[in-house]
UniProtKB/Swiss-Prot annotation:
Its main location: membrane. Keywords: Membrane, Transmembrane, Transmembrane helix. InterPro entries: YjcZ-like. It is a single-pass membrane protein. It comes from Bacillus subtilis (strain 168). Belongs to the SscA family. One of its GO terms (cellular component) is membrane. It comes from the Bacteria. Pfam families: YjcZ_2. The gene is yczM. The chain crosses the membrane at residues 8-28. This is Uncharacterized membrane protein YczM. It is found in: Membrane.
Length: 29
């Protein structure tokens, strides 16, 4: 749970942030 778990969590967080920023950008502009 040291290598794969951390990498997977990081990818998920970045993916969620990307969706939030993308949605805000499309909706705001």
């Amino acid at each position: 749970m040291s290598g794969y778990g951390t990498s997977f969590a990081l990818i998920v967080v970045l993916f969620i942030l990307l969706i939030i920023v993308g949605t805000a950008f499309v909706g705001g502009y």
